[in-house]
Amino acid sequence: MTSTINRPLDGEGSVQVKQDPKINIEEGALVIAVYGKGGIGKSTTSSNLSAAFSKLGKKVLQIGCDPKHDSTFTLTHKMVPTVIDILEEVDFHSEELRPTDFMFEGFNGVMCVESGGPPAGTGCGGYVTGQTVKLLKEHHLLEDTDVVIFDVLGDVVCGGFAAPLQHANYCLIVTANDFDSIFAMNRIVSAIKAKAKNYKVRLGGVVANRSKDTDQIDKFNERTGLKTMAHFKDVDAIRRSRLKKCTIFEMEPTEDVIEVQNEYLSLAKNMLENVEPLEGNPLKDREIFDLLGFD
């Protein structure tokens, strides 16, 4: 007798975090999840993009999804407490919290939340992200938000840290013009393609960061159907803005700074008006190895 094993739905089993339909973000808000190789500049990109959206008159919420809780400090000019830390203080009785306990106003009115995460080696970061969205909904803090940006830990695409993809309309992948960054990007494309079968998330495009050239990124895009939405060269003012704990929009308006500001504003406008969902087709590892590099 032959038995058939049915594949579980997305979110069933030990490798996924099941989406609670009651904690979906309201229709109408543009929800963007930012992924990329660890250390590639996702938090810098997310914060400056949030600032750009706010400059366009949008009400913006940025949610940091990294236990390091360093996503939003250039917006708030300080390290803010995490949702998980605040919940622990009240023994996870969220009804005892006020919005000011866990949500903080940053540059130009951008609202900032750091979800935090469980101690190393314990728990699931995706669960924490879900609880953060649930808490925001309980306090009706998403109802008037135009743009939500999830800044996600490293290039981890397990069921837990893929959780923001369950809320997002689009995913932006931050990459440099090098093998390791593009290799990580390919893994992320695979995760998004898997999630797109059951959720609304689609690829929004690529952000080339800290790269003078984009020839290797261009090769990858051509093979996989991706598109570069913005290109930020290795401008020292961006590095210095992190050290000054501020966004690029608060730096002295030199020629380089204005160029970067305009690129972020252009990216924000395109995400609002001109973004086309991309059908990314990830490569096999050997294919990337053979594709990238020089003849």
From Swiss-Prot:
The keyword Magnesium applies. GO terms for molecular function: 4 iron, 4 sulfur cluster binding; ATP binding; metal ion binding; oxidoreductase activity, acting on iron-sulfur proteins as donors; oxidoreductase activity, acting on the CH-CH group of donors, iron-sulfur protein as acceptor. ATP binds at G39, I40, G41, K42, S43, T44, K68, N209, R210. Coiled coil: none annotated. It is an enzyme of class 1 (oxidoreductase). Mg(2+) binds at S43. The keyword Disulfide bond does not apply. Pathway: Porphyrin-containing compound metabolism; chlorophyll biosynthesis (light-independent). Its EC number is 1.3.7.7. SUPFAM superfamilies: P-loop containing nucleoside triphosphate hydrolases. PROSITE patterns: NIFH_FRXC_1, NIFH_FRXC_2, NIFH_FRXC_3. Pfam families: Fer4_NifH. It catalyses: chlorophyllide a + oxidized 2[4Fe-4S]-[ferredoxin] + 2 ADP + 2 phosphate = protochlorophyllide a + reduced 2[4Fe-4S]-[ferredoxin] + 2 ATP + 2 H2O. One of its GO terms (biological process) is light-independent chlorophyll biosynthetic process. [4Fe-4S] cluster binds at C124, C158. Its cofactor is [4Fe-4S] cluster. Belongs to the NifH/BchL/ChlL family. NCBIfam families: DPOR_bchL (TIGR01281). PANTHER family: LIGHT-INDEPENDENT PROTOCHLOROPHYLLIDE REDUCTASE IRON-SULFUR ATP-BINDING PROTEIN. Component of the dark-operative protochlorophyllide reductase (DPOR) that uses Mg-ATP and reduced ferredoxin to reduce ring D of protochlorophyllide (Pchlide) to form chlorophyllide a (Chlide). This reaction is light-independent. The L component serves as a unique electron donor to the NB-component of the complex, and binds Mg-ATP. Homodimer. Protochlorophyllide reductase is composed of three subunits; ChlL, ChlN and ChlB. This is Light-independent protochlorophyllide reductase iron-sulfur ATP-binding protein.
